[in-house]
Design a protein with these regions (language model features):
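Short glycine-enriched, charge-decorated loop/helix-capping segments at active-site entrances
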Residues: 36-42, 80-84
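Short, conserved glycine- and acidic-residue-centered signature motifs
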Residues: 45
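Active-site oxyanion-binding pockets that recognize sulfate/phosphate
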Residues: 85-89
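Generic beta-structure capping elements
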Residues: 68-70, 84
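Nucleotide and nucleotide-moiety/phosphate-recognizing core
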Residues: 1-40, 49-63, 70-75, 90-136
Length: 137
C-alpha cells in the first residue's frame, strides 16, 4: 500500500502539517469494535501506515478501529483484506456512525474528547462477533 505517497504530496502542496492529518485505519491489535486515537508511533505491520510514515514522518494522528486478530499469523492477511461477516455489521455500522457524529471534536483538535464520544456512542461488543459468525459460514 503506497497511500503515503499521495498523502505526502497533497500535504506538501496544501502546506498541511502532519499533526493536522488524521488517518482512519483498521487495527488488529484492538478487539472488534474498540476505538482508540493515537498520535505518532510505528507502523505495527501496516503497510499503509508504513508508507505514510515514510512520506510524512510519524507525527500524524491515527483513528484506530479495532477488527481483532484472527488468532493465527497465516490468517491475518485474509482477515484484514476480507469482508465483514453479517454478525459484525451492527458494531461496524455503529462505530462508523459514531466516528462521523463525533467529528466536531476531532476537527477542533480534541482527540481525547473525540475518542470518548465515539466510545459513548458505540460501546464495543462484549464478545467477538467474528468468532460467533465463524459457525455461520
Amino acid at each position: 500500500n503506497e497511500s503515503g505517497r499521495a498523502v505526502g504530496e497533497a500535504a506538501r502542496f496544501f502546506k498541511v502539517a502532519p499533526a493536522d492529518i488524521v488517518v482512519f485505519h483498521d487495527e488488529i491489535d484492538l478487539a472488534p469494535g474498540r476505538f482508540r486515537m493515537k498520535t505518532g508511533g510505528g507502523a505495527a505491520g501496516q503497510n499503509g501506515i508504513r508508507s505514510l510514515i515514510a512520506h510524512l514522518g510519524a507525527d500524524f494522528r491515527r483513528a484506530r478501529l479495532g477488527i481483532g486478530h484472527p488468532g493465527q499469523p497465516q490468517l491475518v492477511m485474509p482477515h484484514v483484506l476480507g469482508d465483514f461477516h453479517k454478525a459484525e455489521y451492527p458494531w461496524r455500522d455503529a462505530l462508523l456512525n459514531a466516528c462521523a457524529d463525533a467529528l466536531p471534536f476531532l476537527m477542533a483538535g480534541q482527540d481525547e474528547r473525540y475518542q470518548g464520544e465515539v466510545l459513548r456512542l458505540a460501546p464495543a461488543p462484549k464478545f467477538s462477533p467474528r468468532q460467533a459468525a465463524q459457525g455461520d459460514d
